[in-house]
Amino acid sequence: MASLKNKHFMIGLSLTFIVALFSFLAAKLPILDKVGALTIAILIAILYRHFRGYPEQYSSGITFSSKYLLRFAIILYGLKLNIFDIIGQGSKLLAIDVGVVIFSIVMMLFVNKLLHGDKNIALLLGVGTGVCGAAAIAAVAPIFKSREKDTAISIGIIALIGTIFSLIYTAIYAIFSMTTNVYGAWSGVSLHEIAHVVLAGGFGGSDALKIALLGKLGRVFLLIPLTIVLILIMRFRSSESSSKGRISIPYFLIGFVIMALVNTYVTIPSALLNILNTVSTICLLMAMVALGLNVAFKDLKNRALKPLMTIIITSICLSSLAFIVVHWLYS
């Protein structure tokens, strides 16, 4: 019996790994490199669920990917941060980043209220838009006690919209006259994922990409204080409503902070850092596959339309406002 359970666990884990690896490699191909591995992974998982159903017998391995590998990926995500660079070279951008995070969450909730959408998904999208996309959504989902299908829908939406916006940014840069500093800073402080920032920022050249990454990593850094604030708010609300259902601290975020400190104070060989970043990406993709398997097409039909409209409106407003601020500071 135990061996059968172990076999089912390994099959479930292998399923998420195979789809994740395929998505990782497919995203390196022309055209698909614009779509992104996250989007590919989630779409494959949702299509698998639609045509084959949820593989219930392998759920232990799938759940392991959606919970433990996701947390491990977020811990390793901290290795992307160098706190000295963000506070030093990127201090001006960090000030903008604070405004971006606050604006994204508040605007998302405001538009969502007008559209009578799902508040939990709007919160996830607000944090994802303001901070760092899928990783931020996954990090705060336990704080909001979000359902896995809501987390998956939010991540799928933000991956798709971020890709579209990054392509729009490259078109705007090609058509209109814009300095590399303005373009890089604008991309860094307003696009959703690091991958989107790399895609758009890289189009402006190495100087634009450098400042874009500084702007983006400042937002990743803000995940630390933001989660603390959110935990305090949710704990206060839970204590007001009842003593039950206390909000626990997502301890993997402590690992995220430790990794950020390690990368700041310890010189890690670039080869090792590349390996760890790849491991982090694969683990994150495996988690996305596992989350995507929890989403049926009827969920997308019933729950994704209003959040999609909400994030489009919010992203347009954020991009416009961010451009005005960046143009004023860097022109």
Curated annotation (Swiss-Prot):
Is-annotated flag, keyword Cell inner membrane?
A: no
GO CC aspect terms: plasma membrane
Compartmental location:
Cell membrane
Which key words tag this protein in UniProt? Cell membrane, Membrane, Transmembrane, Transmembrane helix
Q: Which residues form a coiled coil?
A: none
Q: Does the keyword Methyltransferase apply?
A: no
Transmembrane segments annotated in the record for this chain: 9-26, 31-48, 69-88, 93-115, 122-144, 154-176, 183-202, 217-234, 247-269, 273-295, 308-330
Which Pfam families does this one have? Answer: Cons_hypoth698
InterPro entries according to UniProt? UPF0324_pro
What is the topology of this protein in the membrane according to its UniProt annotation?
Multi-pass membrane protein
Q: Which family does it belong to?
A: Belongs to the UPF0324 family.
Put simply, this protein is called UPF0324 membrane protein SACOL0411
Upper classification of the organism:
Bacteria, Bacillati, Bacillota, Bacilli, Bacillales
